[in-house]
Amino acid sequence: MSMTLQPHSLIELPADLDRDRLPRHVAVIMDGNGRWAKQRNLPRIMGHQRGVDTLKDLLRCCKDWGIEALTAYAFSTENWGRPLPEVEFLMTLFEQVLRRELGEMVAEGVQIHFVGDLTCLPKSLQAEIERAVAATANNQKIKFVVATNYGGRREIIHACRSIAAQVKAGLLDPADIDEVLFERHLYTGGLPDPDLLIRTSGELRISNFFLWQVAYAEIYVTKTLWPDFDRSAFHEALRDYQQRQRRFGRV
């Protein structure tokens, strides 16, 4: 697979979108791969493979249109409960895609990050992740965050334990604990919170994703299944986003 895309009708930012009001950070819950495959009498793994192509195009689209960061919810802590052959396929797919796409990501200026408990992943995948993060660390065109073995509740517990350890060691006064400090101990420490959270397939839940980070994100749900979420669908999501008034709890 190559990140180089075919000529596209929506390469430039559509004229009806205000560049100054684009979300800085878009996060996506990529749902519907299995249903997409089932509708076509294909194995579920074909839906996941098509979903990779969709994600690559969305990453390129965000870069083309001037969005600073894209986060993809790739694998949750709960996804280990799926059938073993599917889990094994996904781990292999992640590794293959990283290995094949790294050169293009470097050339395209993509800075890749992984958030989640990576220690549970296969050692070979961990090695590819480390290599990709190191190789793209100085890139500045777009941040690409991949949530892998990620769970929002587990992340918060991890942050609490990290802070508690510093307090116990006498390195931190409990009175100094605030939102800024807490955020530094999250997997996403140093990354901006999402402005827009997109969920495909029509499900009305956030599935234990970014429980802290989406506190003030605008949420957009589409019935489009993830493999069918193209630039036109993303355009519609951004149009909807720009019609909203973000109040952040104020009047």
UniProtKB/Swiss-Prot annotation:
Mg(2+) binds at residues 31, 218. Substrate binds at residues 32-36, 44, 48, 76-78, 80, 82, 199, 205-207. GO terms for biological process: polyprenol biosynthetic process. Signal peptide: none annotated. Disulfide bonds: none annotated. GO terms for molecular function: ditrans,polycis-polyprenyl diphosphate synthase [(2E,6E)-farnesyl diphosphate specific] activity; magnesium ion binding. Its EC number is 2.5.1.-. Homodimer. Belongs to the UPP synthase family. This is Isoprenyl transferase. It comes from Thermosynechococcus vestitus (strain NIES-2133 / IAM M-273 / BP-1).
